[in-house]
Amino acid sequence: MKNQVFLWFLEKDLIILHEIFLVMAIEGEEFRVDIDKILKDKLGKKSVLVPKFLVSWLKKILHQEWMNGYLCGNGKGKVGMEWLDGSLDLLNCKLNVQTNINGVLQEGLDALPGNEGGRYFTIVSNHPLGGQDGVALGSIICHKYDSKMVYLVNDILMNFKGLAPLCVPINKTGRNGRDFPKMVEAAFQSDRNVVMFPAGLCSRKGEDGIIKDIDWKKTFITKSVQYHRDVIPVHFSGQNSDRFYNIARWCKRLHIKFNIAMLYLADEMYKNRGKTFTVTFGEPIPWQTFDKSKTPHEWAQWVKGKVYDLDKQPR
């Protein structure tokens, strides 16, 4: 009976991040990660039949106590840039921020233009980590552009109240799928810089052993052209564990649609605490660059190439 419940539990996708990163929030209840509550809400009385080792594993892999220590402690009440900065402190994340303009490295972001004259940018980056990179990039851009930024992100992140005001949720197939185009339009029409990870997934390790983003989606090209936004390419250093890449590789080989590797992102974030990452911003690419000589998809891969070129040491 227990095995049947366990299999049913998996088949019903009750371990998807939408449920694990819940705001289990009725009025007056704090936002917290609560695996026991998730199981009880979804399985009812059958929740007691879920193997205890599985419940313990979920709590461990998601670092439930550690995350709740911040969400219900120092992070409580913080919003936007303050929440991002607090998250970086929690992660003990150190950043080397620089620009690479025409092969010349310069510390800081003084070489980047501001938003004077209503000039707002589309800022695109590779996505090597899935945790620190998103938090750090948001913090950097908030400080540079006076919090005038908005993420286009997976809608599970809307559950983090401190982050939500900076986010436009992406869920093309869920309840908000019908409103997705309108929300993207609103972001690009706004007086904020739009931050995107065009791959939509964390970087993967290829058969050649190289860790790189999958193909980038073309949305940032088409919308940047439509709304006359120059594109700022960003390279973020770092990588996850071999375990993460091996899980992702085997899921692909076995044609498993559920993104099991995503379950491990909280653990990867935990393991990457205390590390130093280099964040390199390139020169803004004029929106007029993206002409008819390439398709939007081809231009997206071209920009992706420019991002990885930023990681190469100037001569």
Predicted features by range, described:
Residues 13, 18-121, 134-136, 164:
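Membrane-anchoring hydrophobic helices of lipid-metabolizing enzymes
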Residues 2-3, 12:
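Polybasic, lysine-rich low-complexity intrinsically disordered segments
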Residues 88-95, 170-176, 209-210:
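Short, flexible loop segments at the rims of nucleotide/cofactor-binding pockets, characterized by
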Residues 121-175:
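Catalytic core of membrane glycerolipid acyltransferases/transacylases, capturing the structured
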Residues 98-102, 152-154, 170, 284:
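Conserved beta-strand termini and adjacent loop/short-helix elements that scaffold enzyme active sites
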Residues 178-315:
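Non-catalytic C-terminal accessory region of glycerolipid acyltransferases
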Residues 93-100, 176-178, 262-263:
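Short gly/ser/thr-rich secondary-structure transition/capping motifs
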